[in-house]
Amino acid sequence: MAIDEKSLEDFGKLRGKIDISRRGFLKNAGVVVAGAAGAAALAGCSSPKTASSDKSEGGSSANASSGASAYAGNEGKTMGEVLGAGWLGEEPEIAASDIAETKTCDIVVCGAGHAGTATARRAAEKGANVIVVETQTEADFAVLGNDIGHLNSSWQTERHGIPSYDVVDFMNEYQICGAGRVEPTLLSDFANRSGEAFDWFIDNFTEEEKAQIVPLNWPVPDGYDYKKGMFHSYVGTANFGEGVSLKDALIRSQDIAKEAGVEFLYETTGVKLVHNDDNTEVTGIICQQGDKYVEIDAKAVVLCCGDIGSNSEMYNAICAENYWLGEFTDCKAMSGRDGSGIAMAMRMGAKVEIGTGGDMGSHAAFPMSPLEACETIWLNKYGKRFCNEGLGGPLMSGCTPARQPGDILYSIWDADWKPMLLNQIAGHLALKYWDDDTINKIDGYMQAAEQAGKDGSDESGKYLYCADTIEELCDYMGMEEGVKKQVVAAVADWNAAIEAGADMKFGRDVNTMYPIIKAPFYGFAGSKRVGGGSLVSTSGLLVTGDQQVQGQGFEPIKGLYACGNTEGGRFPMGYNGIMNGVSIGMCLTLGYTLGEFLATGDLDEATTLGLNNAEPKQSDKGMPGPPPAA
């Protein structure tokens, strides 16, 4: 997701608790890593007694003598009670007499960002009565992002001639990136309908305004191969950096929603869900508006409240991998959202993402050289190659580097770097443009490094080295003699794999590997950046294919839905970067499909159908089941 500096500055003033600019976040980072985020210790999870923990002669147990409490277990508790112990808190007590006003509608949407606006507008266009509540003021409304990733829009295929992609290939590749944990219906809706949703979003644009939207990584270089091993390169993300900004485009969509009858209540914040005693049904939401409370009752409450970026305790708990990779450095994101929408649902028993959780990139590490995250040969602190650098883009192939010893990663390439760079997979943290201006700029960095000799050049903002031999290049980058020998051997093995036509060591498609044989040679040494945060977190509430929030027993909570960064199921193992702008693309598309469903679908089916199904018959001839409960 791209972030324009002005929107980030505005957004930080309004909502942020973290003063980080995009420029400051990326400046001289050298290596983008995973790292800052993860899971808080689970309540009650002290070490259980083992079979050998017999009582001492005095009768006290080993646990007691060591000061540890006996393990009590967490069975029957909600995820909020276990995962949120110590930080989630209780629902606020708001008496009926404190409610100054009550409104009624079909659908109430909490949040007017990309997902919330799409949900409200589409539902209203389909005949629903919709109210949107938004914390920000209307005058100072801000939103993040410049790019909308999608597939097969008429804007792509007809206006720009971008080839249509096979949605079946896309769904399978995306599911691999999510280790099989992506919610399949959400993925299907995006793959099959994101192009439709994008065309709908820009339908109000003039032809001139549509022409100002830039398709990233288009046109592709001559002879470009879209197939990269098991994966494809998805080009054509819509960039709103010129002409109408994405913020202004979103405000236009809000205006269209208002014309369709949607009521927007700005400076209004949802604070408590209205629900029954057993937490199985939501019938409204209580909001704070200035010094008063307003209750909005509806058939459907949709949480589009953003992520958990400024709430480190929640971030640490829900995004476990990032927290662990950062060795328990508190997680923070630039979004500034506080996770209040997710917390509201968790307090009444809702589940969150069941996976490692994640954010936009801090689960992965790679040498972020002047070639961006180019998938050259990657070497660790020992000078050894250690992974398939070309496995589905840097946010997937970068998972292994994040776990390597030390805090240095090296990248090396040779004089014929242009064909390599122009055949990289498109996506997050890769080059966005393959035009002559971009290549000439990078060529200038190479020339500066060649002239700089052993001191290297930081003309690109990152030190780049150039030498006539691999050994000399290693010396310039400050490697020990033993490490230098490993590098020479790794480069020789790399070239041999290309010659043999198979990378038998790590399985990389040799069509994505380029020889390192022609002088001069270039090298980059990056410091592995661990911890500190990311652009935005991408894990939220567990939802069904209809985006209905799930509670105990994985049953959907009647009347409660989530979309955008408040919902899970999209990036359960962290942001995949399969295309630029895929996060906002999902916000738009899934908001579009959710609004349509809420206005026209059967909202009772998920909580009524199947209640009287017969229990499965159990055979005594197969494998025995678990022992009966004590």
Stretches with model-predicted labels:
Residues 99-113:
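Beta1/beta-strand and adjacent pyrophosphate-binding region of the FAD-binding site
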Residues 71-74, 190-292, 312-313, 497-520, ...:
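Conserved redox-cofactor binding core of oxidoreductases
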Residues 125-142:
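Glycine-rich FAD pyrophosphate-binding loop
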Residues 342-344, 351-479:
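An anion/pyrophosphate-binding glycine-rich loop and adjacent beta-alpha core
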Residues 296-365, 578-580, 584-593:
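Glycine-rich loop(s) and the adjacent beta-strand/alpha-helix scaffold that form part
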Residues 103-105, 291-300:
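Core beta-strand elements of the Rossmann-like FAD/NAD(P) dinucleotide-binding domain
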